[in-house]
Amino acid sequence: MKKIILFFIIINLFACKKERKISETFSFIKTEIKLPINKNGNTIKTRFNLLDGFTRITTKPNTFQNYLQHFKLKPVDSKVHLYNGALKYNQSIHAGILAISVGNRDLQQCADATMRLRAEFLFTQKRYNDIHFNFTNGFRVDYSKWRKGFRLKVKGNKVSWYKTDKESTSYKSFTQYMQWIFMYAGTLSLNKEMKSIPISKMQIGDVFIQGGSPGHAIIVVNMAKNTQNKTVFMLAQSYMPAQDIHILKNLNNTSISPWYNAKNLTVLQSPEWEFSNKDLKRFN
């Protein structure tokens, strides 16, 4: 797509592109973390064993939470690849890799991965009217309109729809719609679309997100509790360049990795970004 306007380039160049000191600290640490892994498990729910005394959060069928818990993973010891087939420079921070394509363009980065997972779930549920995202200029892009054969036209900072002859309801067409979202949406726009959630109300599918230049987003993909009502959770991300969506290790508390402790959480230090407890948000 050569017709990428300067406004979007400036915003998206910095959407997920600058590592903070936390990533400089952990990037090349050779971590020897004994992960609680069931090598025969092929989903997020079955791959990672529970910590002692904890019970996995039960999710209802046909919900986003259940969809993420049962998301298939690539085989144990798989490596994180970039969109161009190259290996990610740092292979020491992931505990597992989601079995979903990254595409062959440098598009599916941080916020894009969370939007992809959300949209894929809604697509499988045939909830097409619920699939919509805003571009960074505020223009709302509804997948339901795309399915009817409408396409997007970008001129300067203006976006408009135009009608083609045919409806396009295939999965391939859906992925083409998502590429437009990846190009013109990001942490800045997604952050404005989501609603803030306190840590005490965290659910699977919630997102830690910082919108801006730079910005980043990681998604909660599993949770568990014990009898003392202590909660732990698991996180997944993509990064830049566009790369496989992967489960993050907990480098700050290797004894519970890849789980993270929600109790008294004020600062969340993930391997490549630092978040605040105020950064937790939920899809509407």
Positions of predicted regions on the chain:
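Positively charged n-region of N-terminal signal peptides that target proteins for export
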Residues: 1-4
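C-terminal motif of bacterial Sec signal peptides marking the signal peptidase cleavage site
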Residues: 13-15
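Cationic-aromatic interfacial patches
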Residues: 17-101, 108
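Extracellular-facing segments of soluble proteins and assemblies that are Gly/Ser/Thr-biased and enriched
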Residues: 99, 103-195
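Short, well-ordered loop/turn sites that connect or cap secondary structure elements
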Residues: 196-203
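Short coil-to-beta-strand transition motifs
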Residues: 209-217
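Short beta-strand-centered aromatic/proline hotspots
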Residues: 216-225
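Low-complexity, Gly/Ser/Thr/Pro-rich intrinsically disordered linker/tail segments
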Residues: 231-284
